[in-house]
Amino acid sequence: MPGEKSTTNLLRRVREEELPLTLVIINAAAEMYRGAIPRDCWHEPYMSDRELDEEIRAGVEFWGYEQQGRLVGVMGTQAVRDVDLIRHAYVLPSCQGQGVGGALIAHLRDLSARRMLVGTWAAASWAIRFYERHSFQLLEPEMTRRLLQAYWRIGERQIETSVVLANPPYQ
């Protein structure tokens, strides 16, 4: 009926006009990193408009989870040579623990026929557990370093303080 709120949940690409909301979601959820990741790696905002634009220009495609007509979670993918990277996976704090992130990652895995890699902060134990619950395997430090150097455009400090998880795992 007109005027009623939708009770359906929807997985879809994030629309251009939702990029400001995407930043709100990313920066709100990234607050969990404050005090957990090395102090010299934290900055405010965690992601700026400029950084989001750069990520999109570099090929990151954002998918969103809409709950009752409201975007509450985002997760990006980026095709890099022979793999797909999971990039910038964030859910509004008030919606965490409700299956939003799990639905997003399952959807992105369904869309990809290639190995998927995700990098996150080594100190973000909650993020590592999330990816492990969704069949990603934490890789050894030597392999992590090689993959971060090969597939991501990040500085040495971030390489030193990050981990990589893979699905399917490397043998």
Predicted regions and their residues:
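Conserved beta-strand-loop-alpha-helix junction that forms the acyl-donor binding cleft
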Residues: V118-I128, T144-Q149
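Terminal substrate-recognition subdomain of acyl/acetyltransferases
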Residues: P2, V118, R133, Q137, ...
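A short, internal acetyl-CoA/4′-phosphopantetheine-binding micro-motif in the GNAT/acyltransferase core
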Residues: A89-Q96, T120-A122
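Conserved GNAT-fold acetyl-CoA-binding loop/helix
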Residues: N27-L52
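Conserved acetyl-CoA-binding loop-helix of GNAT-fold acetyltransferases
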Residues: V91, G97-D110, R133
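A short beta-loop-alpha structural element at the N-terminal edge
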Residues: L10-V24
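Conserved beta-strand in the GNAT
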Residues: G64, R70-Q78, L85-Y90
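A short helix-loop-beta-strand connector motif used in the catalytic cores of GNAT acetyltransferases and
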Residues: R50-G64, Q158-T161
